[in-house]
């Protein structure tokens, strides 16, 4: 397993349109989706995730880090986004 910290633009280039499963856990709320087409993009102030009929927007200023874990044995890449509000978004991309 290889772990890397990556920039937002690298994350967007790798996940702009992909098949993914994921979950987002924030204080008082959570969402999850499985094996669905994911679209990611950003504007000047927010990072947007669209999975099916679900959209999640995160202020860019609240993102502390994005980690990329390459799981070679199961041919999956996992991305973990950690926010200032102690929120975590985990995406598994095949």
Describe the predicted segments one by one.
Residues 1-8:
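Amphipathic/hydrophobic helical signal segments and adjacent flexible N-terminal regions
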Residues 13-25:
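A short, Trp-centered hydrophobic/proline-enriched beta-strand micro-motif
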Residues 14-15, 41-44, 74:
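Short, solvent-exposed coil/turn segments at beta-strand boundaries
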Residues 26-28, 51-55, 84-88:
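Glycine-centered tight beta-turn/hairpin loop motif at sheet-sheet or coil-to-beta transitions
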Residues 31-39:
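Short beta-strand-centered aromatic/proline hotspots
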Residues 36-37, 55-72:
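Structured surface patches comprising rigid loops and adjacent beta-strands/short helices at the edges
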Residues 43-48, 77-79:
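Short aromatic-glycine-enriched beta-strand elements
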Residues 64-94:
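Short, compact, well-ordered microdomains
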């Amino acid at each position: 397993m290889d772990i890397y910290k990556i920039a937002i633009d690298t994350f967007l280039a790798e996940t702009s349109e992909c098949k993914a499963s994921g979950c987002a856990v924030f204080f008082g709320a959570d969402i999850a989706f499985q094996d669905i087409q994911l679209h990611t993009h950003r504007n000047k102030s927010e990072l947007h995730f669209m999975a099916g009929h679900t959209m999640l927007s995160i202020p860019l200023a609240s993102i502390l880090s994005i980690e990329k874990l390459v799981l070679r044995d199961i041919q999956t890449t996992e991305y973990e986004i950690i926010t200032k509000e102690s929120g975590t978004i985990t995406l598994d991309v095949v």
